[in-house]
């Protein structure tokens, strides 16, 4: 007699803006359920991004298995699509071993790809892309960003206006398909990963508190040696940095110190900009999560008692 296929256990997802306490909560939950952590962070996957990527401590990594941490070399391609596919495979493998997964991170496209799946987007069109790049060179990011904001404000709100790669791609998709990225993603609404059930919790806090935490964490990173880490990367990967082709080397916390090392800004300005750019990034993360994902928001724990209480609640969820 055939037995019914066993239902997959739910996957706990913990998301939120940077500095909201996701990693600590994920570790606490994983300990309670005997699970493993799937890191949804596009920088933590790379070796050598340590302090600037706010990687878990060596003790945390030794205590609970963290997937997608220290698995790639800088410059090695790894897309959101790669993450979505590989993360789903690892979660299913964990389930077969009788273990559960805790997904934690703030990389918006990693999370969307895993939880919702991606819309089928068209391949690049060389002619359209060349024309848009020409417009970018002549008119600058600001005008192209305004053009995107008029056509797809939800997508525009999730982008850094100073970065051109996703801006150009978003406009290219509109010209090729006649539809915006937001419209295509809304049409997709499909699960790509079989019977996986994601229970998504978002960590919320007052904006002033979040910004204070960001500023404090930046100061702690500086004290821990972030500048020396950035300086080492600057000298080792100078050609890659200058090429602008490796997006991870353009990320917050590193690019500002690279500008200082290039003699473009002062050290104090670099620190100030890291804080400012991190706050801007947190705002874009929140916009994305509210616009593109279905999230159960809860107050972020601000002390050890609140952390343990929330971890206990999540561990006993569906």
From Swiss-Prot:
Looking up InterPro entries in the UniProt record yields: Dimethylallyltransferase, IPT, P-loop_NTPase
Does Magnesium appear among the keywords?
Answer: yes
Q: Record-annotated residues binding substrate?
A: 18-23
Q: Which domain of life is it from?
A: Bacteria
Q: Where is this region: Interaction with substrate tRNA?
A: 41-44, 165-169
Q: Where does ATP bind?
A: 16-23
Catalysis: reaction(s): adenosine(37) in tRNA + dimethylallyl diphosphate = N(6)-dimethylallyladenosine(37) in tRNA + diphosphate
Any one Gene Ontology MF annotation carried by this entry is: ATP binding
The UniProt record lists the keyword Transferase: yes
Q: What is its EC number?
A: 2.5.1.75
Family indicated by similarity: Belongs to the IPP transferase family.
Briefly state the protein's biological role.
Answer: Catalyzes the transfer of a dimethylallyl group onto the adenine at position 37 in tRNAs that read codons beginning with uridine, leading to the formation of N6-(dimethylallyl)adenosine (i(6)A).
Question: In its UniProt entry, what is this protein called?
Answer: tRNA dimethylallyltransferase
Which lineage?
A: Bacteria, Pseudomonadati, Chlorobiota, Chlorobiia, Chlorobiales
Q: What is the name of the gene encoding this protein?
A: miaA
